[in-house]
């Protein structure tokens, strides 16, 4: 995928245009391969959080990426520092699929997708306006980084049923938390490999393991093997920080024919 042509024209990408906003959502921002907007549920909850989605409508034949694309690609990024009364925003990702399109292997979505996001208010009882700088890759045979600012006033239509339904459905589609019978166990590896044992229901041939390179980690595509009736994924560690972090962990998603789960694994 490194050989894909990259087309970047600043904040005005290709034939990009802004379509009118409605309800507690931003205007659609359109580019050659699709369009993107922010949708919110409107009202903040008691903890000062507003739920929303980054809604990505892809044209047929186009794709976008998971939190760690793989060989190449641009993961979705959301910067809310220009917002009013928004402290931060956390993106979540539905289970990706693994693809090999001849240019490289990548993890993501070749269909329209809504990425859930939680906005945290700086002051829970005060009004907020979201000004989100969005950066993501939408690719076909060329890869077009989409770069724009999406603005939402969540209180403009806080009881909009369509917006609330989209947000609710998108959060419901996220992988469930990993558990003992559907998750991974980290096995002994070495400085250059991450090895995990996968526990899951369903067909072993349909299972896949995705781990996100964060905190200066970079991973290759996993290989599969079997040991004592268990499916083993061995993931090359292509790069790593000089010192292993002691806080947090690496996001992973495990998929199977029966669904998907996600969790954090210790830094290798």
Give the location of each predicted region.
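N-terminal secretory signal peptides that target proteins for export/translocation
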Residues: 1-2
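Bacterial N-terminal signal peptides
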Residues: 5-17
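Extracellular/lumen-exposed scaffold segments
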Residues: 22-268
């Amino acid at each position: 995928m490194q050989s894909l042509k990259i087309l970047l024209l600043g904040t005005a990408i290709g034939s990009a245009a802004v379509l009118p906003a409605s309800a507690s959502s931003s205007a659609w921002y359109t580019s050659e391969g699709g369009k993107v907007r922010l949708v919110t549920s409107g009202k903040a909850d008691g903890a000062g959080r507003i739920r929303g989605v980054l809604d990505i409508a892809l044209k047929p034949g186009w794709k976008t990426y998971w939190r760690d694309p793989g060989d190449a690609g641009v993961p979705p990024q959301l910067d809310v520092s220009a917002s009013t009364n928004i402290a931060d925003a956390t993106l979540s990702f539905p289970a990706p699929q693994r693809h090999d399109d001849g240019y490289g292997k990548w993890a993501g979505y070749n269909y329209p997708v809504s990425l859930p996001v939680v906005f945290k208010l700086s002051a829970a009882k005060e009004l907020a306006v979201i000004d989100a700088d969005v950066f993501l890759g939408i690719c076909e045979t060329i890869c077009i980084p989409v770069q724009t600012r999406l603005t939402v006033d969540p209180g403009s239509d806080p009881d909009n049923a369509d917006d609330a339904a989209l947000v609710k459905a998108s959060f419901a589609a996220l992988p469930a938390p990993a558990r003992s019978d559907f998750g991974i166990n980290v096995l002994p590896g070495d400085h250059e490999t991450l090895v995990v044992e996968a526990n899951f229901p369903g067909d072993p041939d349909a299972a896949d393991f995705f781990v996100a390179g964060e905190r200066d980690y970079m991973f290759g595509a996993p290989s599969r093997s079997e040991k004592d009736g268990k499916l083993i994924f061995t993931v090359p560690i292509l790069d790593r920080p000089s010192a292993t972090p002691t806080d947090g962990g690496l996001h992973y998603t495990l998929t199977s024919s029966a669904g998907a789960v996600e969790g954090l694994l210790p830094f290798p």
